Amino acid sequence: MVKTKIPAKLENLESMLQFIRNGAEQQGFSGKEINKIQVAAEEALVNVISYAYPDDGGDVEIRCNAKGAEGLVIEIIDWGIPFDPLSLSEPDIEAPPEEREVGGLGIHIMRNIMDEVSYKREGDRNILTLVKR
């Protein structure tokens, strides 16, 4: 397992995604699959950057664990306000955009790209886990 801890700021997003790209390459995913993994991870990371620390900044820790047949396990950890993104209802993607509720589309994208998406609150940490096989 490799991990990095970076200030949760938009200007660090590219280096966060590169870290995840490196983990996916190590697991042997194709370029197309890596791009999809990065889209899912970007949705999660932008949520952390935008909402985890409303008053002042904080860090995000990213762990990538290449597990062979079990796939790539990405953990996105923050110490921000407790929030389970999976508790949001699925968006009605069939509805016209002007009739859709705000929010939830990023989680929908993550769930459709990744094989598993899970959340847990552990002590003072939010842990979002993304798995791709």
Model-derived segments and spans:
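Conserved short strand/loop->alpha-helix "switch" segment adjacent to the catalytic nucleotide/phosphoryl-transfer site
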Residues: 20-42, 99-101
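Glycine-rich phosphate-binding loop
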Residues: 99-114
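Flexible, glycine-/charge-rich segments associated with ATP-binding catalytic modules
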Residues: 1-5, 111-133
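Short helix-loop "hinge" at the ATP-lid/N-box region of the Bergerat-fold HATPase_c
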Residues: 48-52
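Helix-loop-beta hinge of the Bergerat
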Residues: 2-31
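Short beta-strand/loop element within the Bergerat-fold HATPase_c
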Residues: 59-70
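Conserved polar catalytic motif of the HATPase_c/GHKL fold
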Residues: 42-47, 112
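Glycine-rich/acidic phosphate-handling loop/turn and adjacent ATP-lid/helix
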Residues: 74-101
